Amino acid sequence: MNFGRVNPAQTLDAQGITGLGEVHYNLIEPALVEAAVTRGEGRLGRGGAFLCSTGAFTGRSPKDKFVVRTPSVEDTIWWENNAPMDPAAFDRLHADMLEHMKGRTYFVQDLFAGADPELRLDVRMVTELAWHGLFIRHMLRRPERAELDSFVPDWTVINCPSFKADPERHGCRTDTVIVLNFERKLILIANTEYAGENKKSVFTLLNYILPGKGVMAMHCSANHALGDTDDAAVFFGLSGTGKTTLSADPSRTLIGDDEHGWSDRGTFNFEGGCYAKTINLSAEAEPEIYATTSKFATVVENMVYDEETLELDFNDDSLTANTRCAYPLDYISNASESGLGGHPKNVIMLTCDAFGVLPPIARLTPAQAMYHFLSGFTSKVAGTERGVTEPQPTFSTCFGAPFMPRRPEVYGKLLQEKIAKHGATCWLVNTGWTGGAYGTGKRMPIKATRALLTAALDGSLSGVQFRRDPNFGFEVPVDLHGVDAKLLDPRSTWADPAAYDQQAKKLVEMFANNFAQYVPFIDADVKAAAIG
C-alpha cells in the first residue's frame, strides 16, 4: 500500500521493487518524526529534536565498502582504494535484499544531490528506518512538492539495516556491506544503522560522476562574504578537523559544511543540510550549531541524555566520540538559500596534526597546495570510523580518500587547474595539537584559529611579515594582532625544543615516504615542492 506524493510512473513497483508492505513516499518532517517515534526508533527530545542510537555501528565502515567491477568503470576506478565486487555477486545481493524487504514498511525520499540545477543528480533514497528518511531529507536538497510529480530518479539507494549479507554468497567482507553499481545506478547498504553511510555513499557517487564533466568534487565546507558571493572560500578537511565549525562564521554566509563542487560557474553545495559533531559542543563556542540540537526534527545521533529531563550531555562519549546532529541548512541563520557561490578566493586545507609540529596557519604556493592536497595529512579523530578511539596520524589523499573512486591525480589536476585559472590563495591550517604531541600538548585554541582565518579571508594576513618554515618550506606569519606570537612558532611552544626538532624530522620523513606513490604522476613544480 502506497502513501504520500510520488510520480505515478516511478513507484517502487515500477522499479521492480515489489511485494513490500506499506511504502511512504516523500513524507515531510513532522510525519517522519511521528513515524519514527511511533515505531520505537528513538525518542522525541527537547524542542522536538529526534534522539536516536545507531546500535553497534557508530561510525562508517570503510572496509565494507565496494564498487561493482563493470566494463564501464574498469579503467577509471582507483581499485587500490576501492574494493571490487563481482557483478554476479552484486546481483545475488540485490535479489536477496529485495526478497528480505517483502512485506516490510519502507520510506522513500526523492531528493536532489547538488544545488546547481545543471549538474545535480536526482536521487531516490529507500530506507527501512523512518529516521533515516528524515536524516537524508535534511542532508540532500528537497524538491518543491510540485516537482515530485515528475521526479525520475537517476540513482536509487536502498538502505536495509535488518538485512545481513553473506560474505561467501555476496562477495563481501562481513555481514555489513555498502556497494555502488555504476552500471545499474544503484547503491545497496545493509546491516548498519549509522546514518552517515547514506550521505557518504551519495558523495562517493558524485565524486565519480562530476570530474568526468570537468567539475572538481571536494570534501570541504564553503562560505562567502556577506552580500558578496564572489568572495568565496572552501575548507578541505577530514571528519573532525573543523570544516563545520570553522565555516559557520557569523560574519560570512554559509554555503555548506561538507561536500561541494567547483564548476566553471563557481562553487555549489551538494547538500541541503549539515551533519555536525556534537562532542564537547558548547553554546559559547558554537552557539548556532548548539541551538540546532533542540530544534524540531533535528536528528541527534548517539548522544547520552537524561531519561527524565531529556537534557543532552555534550561531554559524554560513552556510546561513541562520534556523537552528531543532522539538521537542514536553514537552521543556521546566515546560510545560503541557493547553495551557490563564486570561484573561491581562498582555499584552506585543514589538518589535525596529532604530532604538534605544524603551525596554526601557513601560506602555500599553488604547487605546495597540490602537494598537501595529494598528501592529505591529518589525524583520524576518535569515533569517525569504527575502532578509532584516539587520534591516529594518517595520510588521506584529497582529504577524503574513503570517498574518492578515481585516482588522486584526477582530483589533484582538476584542483590545480581551478586554482591557477581563478588565482586562489591557498592556506594550510592546523586545528590539532600545539605545545607537544597528543597526550602532552593541548588542542589549538579555536579563538586563535578563527582570528587567523578571519585575517586570511579578509586579506589582512597577507600584509604581515612571514617566515619560511625550515622543515616544510611554506610561509608562516610572524605575528598577528590578537594572536599569541608563540603559537605561530610551534617550536617555541614545546618545553623541549630538541624534542620538537626530532618530532618534526619524523613527520617530514612520513610525508616523504607517503608522497613517493604520487611522484610518477605529477608535474615538476609539485615535485620541487615536495618535503624531505
UniProtKB/Swiss-Prot annotation:
Subcellular location(s) of the protein: Cytoplasm
Main location: cytoplasm
Entry annotated with the keyword Flavoprotein: no
Binding positions for Mn(2+) per the UniProt entry: K200, H219, D258
One MF annotation (Gene Ontology) recorded for this entry: phosphoenolpyruvate carboxykinase (ATP) activity
Family of this protein: Belongs to the phosphoenolpyruvate carboxykinase (ATP) family.
Protein name in the entry: Phosphoenolpyruvate carboxykinase (ATP)
Upper taxonomic lineage: Bacteria, Pseudomonadati, Pseudomonadota, Alphaproteobacteria, Rhodobacterales
